[in-house]
Swiss-Prot record:
Protein name in UniProt: Probable GTP-binding protein EngB
Record-annotated disulphide pairs: none
One GO molecular-function entry: GTP binding
UniProt xrefs under Pfam families: MMR_HSR1
One of the protein's GO biological processes: division septum assembly
Family classification: Belongs to the TRAFAC class TrmE-Era-EngA-EngB-Septin-like GTPase superfamily. EngB GTPase family.
Amino-acid biosynthesis as UniProt keyword: no
Length: 219
């Protein structure tokens, strides 16, 4: 079966849930393919989702870091979803709420069988904070590929941008092929084709391709 290209512009809001337990209640089971977006509260996660889907308000942006407290799910088609995870690491969030978010993130990454890939978004000027590394380590430990997306790349000159990209690639080289590193700018569109190509690949895991082939052959 030839790998089809997913039209990410067709993404539409599906549900919000406070944690993975509620996610299981609303979704048709742990099935299909999900790609998760995770990042610190000021990493530009909502802006990146809007830029990648070419929708200005798919994910709601806010000047107040820490606003996204829910797991928000967007549907691409009957088999595939994008999942916007709660922003983490915002200092002014109460400790109890922060711990609740961390628990929800950890449960999702470690227990969600349909998770095909995780995009960990980091401000290119402040990459690889402790919580970023924890997210990456959780995902790789569960054998889930990671795209470390260095956002707001338009904030740096080209030489400084590539210096940071290379430093992050070196720092994450211990994870081998499980982690890819790319610069990205929601404002300028820098890196968008590369990111969409990676997401498209994640949308076509071998098991889903085999399943769809079997269904087509049975018709």
């Amino acid at each position: 079966m030839t790998e089809s290209r997913i039209d990410f512009r067709r993404a539409k809001f599906l549900i919000s849930a406070p944690d993975i337990a509620h996610l299981d209640q609303y979704l048709p089971g742990d099935v299909g393919v999900e790609i998760a977006f995770a990042g610190r509260s000021n990493a530009g996660k909502s802006s990146a989702l809007n830029a990648l889907t070419e929708q200005k308000s798919l994910a709601r942006t806010s000047k107040t870091p820490g606003r996204t407290q829910l797991i928000n799910v967007f549907e691409l088609d009957a088999q595939r979803r994008l999942v916007d995870l709660p922003g983490y690491g915002f200092a002014q969030v109460p400790l109890a709420l922060k711990n609740k978010w961390q628990q929800a993130l950890g449960e999702y990454l470690q227990k969600r069988a349909c998770l095909s890939g995780v995009v960990v978004l980091m401000d290119i000027r402040h990459p690889l904070k402790d919580l970023d590394m924890q997210m990456i380590e959780w995902a790789v430990a569960s054998e889930i590929p990671v795209l470390a997306l260095l956002t707001k790349s338009d904030k740096l000159a080209q030489s400084a941008k590539m210096k940071t990209v290379n430093e992050v690639r070196l720092a994450l080289s211990e994870f081998g092929d499980w982690v890819q590193v790319e610069p990205f700018s929601s404002l300028k569109g820098t890196g968008k084709p590369k990111v969409l190509a990676i997401l498209n690949e994640w949308c076509h895991p071998q098991w889903l391709t085999d399943e769809l082939d079997a269904a087509n052959n049975a018709e």
